Amino acid sequence: MSASVLIIYTGGTIGMKEDPMDGTLKPFDFSQIKAEVPELNKFAVRIDSYTFDPLIDSSDVEPSLWISLAEIIRDRYEEYDGFVILHGTDTMAYSASTLSFMLEGLTKPVIFTGSQLPIGVPRTDGKENLISAVEIAAAKDEKGHARVPEVAICFDSQLLRGNRCVKYSAEAFNAFASPNCPPLAEAGINIRYNTDLIRKPIYWDAQLRVQTRLDTRVSILKVHPGMTPQVMRSVVCDPLTRACILETYGSGNALSRDWFLDILREAAGSGKILLNVTQCKSGTVNMDLYATGASLKHAGVLSGVDITTEAALGKLFCLMGRNDNNDWVKTMLEKDLCGEISK
């Protein structure tokens, strides 16, 4: 065998098949994955599986799942060349984003995938997604290094950087989009890798470092017409949080009213971390472009550049878990740590 891949099944639609007795969808035994997807036998890859018990509906995902995933990968890191994580689509972008920050010094592929239809139904997209994910997780270059040493999402013939993804559709097979970062690879007759976009480790023999301490004291405020000072204050100034993600209009704009800016200054003055993320799916925050954006900057709000809300949340969880000093966290927030923002 030229490579070995561990498939980790957390739950989700992809692992279901119809029970011939009553017609209901039930999870199948992933130790028999090659029987369910015989196309995998054509790869010279050793495939093992690990199944969560109980399985997790992705709507119920908590940080404890991310910690478990990181520990599973850490404990089996030397045994496998790559990892495929099967996950429900609803929160896959959150999980892929956060795991990208938790796994430092990554030199092997960690590929998330899932499906819109179960593997056990005729028109499933699950088989193609799984086959492509396994092939990418096992792929090596001419030097024997992993072709994609990143956390990524493989869906509908595209490989997308995990911390750049958003769920795009609840129904279409192309469920995920990466508006601000082109695909890392595209699967057609062959898999075409966009090697210039794929991040490479500084040292291929680097030791994997796993960050399992997460601080989840983060709130999210979506700026909207009609928002009242009372509502804003309850979110931004909540004493139980260390940070607040502000989802703003366009290039990072928001209200210019005095009460709005006063609340931001109050929160920032108390040490709260305030991060500006655009509500737009594509584009970037530029607080120097308009007066309303500049007023946020002067009030102590940091630019999230073109980070997604999912990645901003995971980045804050990890940075705050690593250090209790909010000034350090603010400094690190503005750095590109693993391809999550354009610099």
Which residue stretches match the model-derived regions?
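ATP/NTP phosphate-donor binding region
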Residues: 1-75, 262
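Gly/Ser/Thr-rich loops at beta-strand to alpha-helix junctions
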Residues: 12-15, 87-93, 158-160, 250-253, ...
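Short Gly/Thr/Asp-enriched flexible loops that form oxyanion-binding sites at enzyme active sites
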Residues: 85-108, 256-263, 292
